[in-house]
Amino acid sequence: MLFNILILSALSLQLCTCFHIKRNLNGSNDVIWDYYDDSKKVQGVSLGGWFVLEPYITPSLFEQFGEDEKKIPVDEYTFTEQLGKDEAQKQLDKHWATYFTESDFKDIKDYGLNLVRIPIGYWAFYLLEDDPYVQGQEPYLDKALEWAKQNDLKVWIDLHGVPGSQNGFDNSGKRGNVTWQDDEENIELSYKTLNYIFGKYGGENLTDTVIGIEIVNEPFHSKLNETDMLDFYYNSYYDFRIKHNSRNFFLIQEAFEPIGFWNTHLNNDYTNVSKPFLNDELLEEGVPKNYFHDIVLDHHHYEVFSVDQLDKSENARIQDIKNYGESVAKEQEYHPSLVGEWSGAITDCAKWLNGVGTGARYDGTFDESQLVRTNAINGTAESQFKFKDKKRSCENVTFVEDFSKQHKENIRKFIEIQLLTYENSNSGWIFWNYKTENAIEWDFKKLVEHKLFPHPFNEYKYFYENGTQIVESAASGNPQNLLFITLSALLVSLSTLL
């Protein structure tokens, strides 16, 4: 037994260096936070559904419109449009005041987490003339920063939705067509919003709490003009560093670009890549030495938004995560990065996860055509549910009370391998989401309560710390098998270092 313990200890020590992150010498902001510090990873949660409504996070807000999904709002835009300004203001004032409170921040700290990512839409600060949105979120954002500071939590402020929608998802505030770049007014208001955020939240007075501002969440590069998108990133960086002289971290969401795409962008070592996107004013004044610094890349990774992903076996899903981690590890020398959204989901069965009226891929009811529906008021949209190729049922995989033992094990394994991989391959992780009303695969709090999320976070049941899976006989305590598996795992670990 003692020999086994010594072997395990040696294995853990070896693993500490498996994915050592190289330091990008352009970085200079260790005082605020060091994203290259292997001893202090980001371990965070998002506070989704608070300032940007998502039907699957808080379905009760949308269920008040009845059972006919043709008439249920699909996003915050149609929610406020359908209720009207006065009623929407009344309901959302209550929601903002109660959905997250000071006690949540204390609980988040008590769970051992160190960061919260706070999504917020442009409409919290400015409105287009015909916007139905209501305002009042900003005072609660300010309270959130106070609560975070009181509980020694760091904060990412994330501009989750921009005018016209950057991706067409309901989490951008407006589901349907991607029209962000179609109107110059949309772009101008996006810059105006960011400059307000940079000025108020990006200064040194908040660097003890805010350790990054994310300029736009999940712009869908394939549905955008990529050159214009890159212009927006570079111009926003100029505003951040030069106009506002911010020393904070500039966060870029990967825009669904392939891993490695951002290596040479916003990087002092690749001026030939950056130069076409630098504005004339900067070029005339002269680009400061080490102009690009303290830039962090935010990756989002899920395994449930395609039929191919859902059809994968448990082992294939686990291998996907390992491969993903290896790819992400290779980009660290260019920009530190972390996985800023991931979940425990191995199905897409949570009610309205894919959007109101769209069904689920898992059971064959998904109808992608419904994603372009933008007007829920007149009821003109057809509600089509496709039942072709129905192989599985969501009946026993939606609510934890119905989960089989095997399904629970599969979720726990999926979460464990992600924790292991994201801890070891980059600067950490931010789980989506801290809580929901009933979508447990996306609910950190419920997952921990039901022992589906390791707590403490390194309390692994199914994997050694190098990602080698523990076989059942070893886990059950058979000394000979345990020794054999442990030695095998050690050899695997050593081979990766040679």
Curated annotation (Swiss-Prot):
Query: Which reaction does this enzyme catalyse, per its entry?
Result: Successive hydrolysis of beta-D-glucose units from the non-reducing ends of (1->3)-beta-D-glucans, releasing alpha-glucose
User: Pfam families, alphabetically?
Assistant: Cellulase
Q: Which PROSITE patterns match?
A: GLYCOSYL_HYDROL_F5
- The enzyme class is hydrolase
Q: Indicate where this protein resides in the cell.
A: Secreted
Q: Sorted alphabetically, which keywords does the UniProt record give?
A: Cell wall biogenesis/degradation, Disulfide bond, Glycosidase, Hydrolase, Secreted, Signal, Zymogen
Question: What is the active site of this protein?
Answer: 218, 341
Q: Name one GO biological process term.
A: cell wall organization
Enzyme Commission number(s) from the entry: 3.2.1.58
Which GO CC annotations does the UniProt entry carry? Answer: cell surface; extracellular region
> Where in the chain are disulfide-linked cysteines found?
349-394
Signal peptide location in the record? 1-18
Q: What is its main location?
A: secreted
Q: What this chain does, per the record? A: Beta-glucanases participate in the metabolism of beta-glucan, the main structural component of the cell wall. It could also function biosynthetically as a transglycosylase.
Give the family, as the similarity comment puts it. Answer: Belongs to the glycosyl hydrolase 5 (cellulase A) family.
> How is this protein named in the record?
Glucan 1,3-beta-glucosidase 1
Gene symbol here is EXG1
